[in-house]
Amino acid sequence: MVAASHRSPDRPGDPEGLEPGTGRGRRLGIDVGTVRIGVASSDPDGILATPLETVRRERSGKHLRRLATLVGETEAVEVIVGLPRTLADRIGSSAQDAIDLADELAARVAPIPVRLADERLTTVSAQRSLREAGVRAKNQRAVIDQAAAVAILQAWLDQRRTLAGGRADG
């Protein structure tokens, strides 16, 4: 495991998490799965998250190279990795996997900050949204990871905007 010191504070409201240079610009949201990794991107103003790509997880680490490439290609100023805590707010094996991936990616894309964001139930929420949109179950597999990444990133953007607005008013 790579030292966690490469990662930045994990909460969008952290004063330390709003460093100069990370105000405007695209953010990437990442949903870490055991087989596939969903990636979403925001607009430069940080208002709307949209699906970007599904990256196949490889033992060789090729997925990390692809994620780092996407950070560069999109000119991302920040990367948000979903942290799937348990409902009891504990870190299980899936969360540890996300932490490890975030640490490895942070080492590759430094000085771009890589943060963790709570993502409990985002895949369930993404599945429900796809089902309600009429996407058949067998077709969901191709886009579910991207939809979960969109949910993670959009929630983070919304929370960050709310907290930044509260600071500006206070």
Swiss-Prot record:
Q: Name one GO biological process term.
A: rRNA 5'-end processing
> Positions of the region Disordered?
1-29
In its UniProt record, a GO molecular function of this protein is: nuclease activity
What domain of life?
Bacteria
Keyword annotations of the record: Cytoplasm, Hydrolase, Nuclease, Ribosome biogenesis
Hydrolase listed as a keyword? yes
EC code(s) of this entry: 3.1.-.-
* InterPro entries reported for this sequence: RNaseH-like_sf, YqgF, YqgF/RNaseH-like_dom, YqgF/RNaseH-like_dom_sf
Subcellular location(s) per record:
Cytoplasm
Looking up PANTHER family in the UniProt record yields: POLYNUCLEOTIDYL TRANSFERASE, RIBONUCLEASE H-LIKE SUPERFAMILY PROTEIN
- Function as written in the Swiss-Prot or TrEMBL entry: Could be a nuclease involved in processing of the 5'-end of pre-16S rRNA.
Q: What is the protein name for this chain?
A: Putative pre-16S rRNA nuclease
- What is the organism field in this record? Mycobacterium marinum (strain ATCC BAA-535 / M)
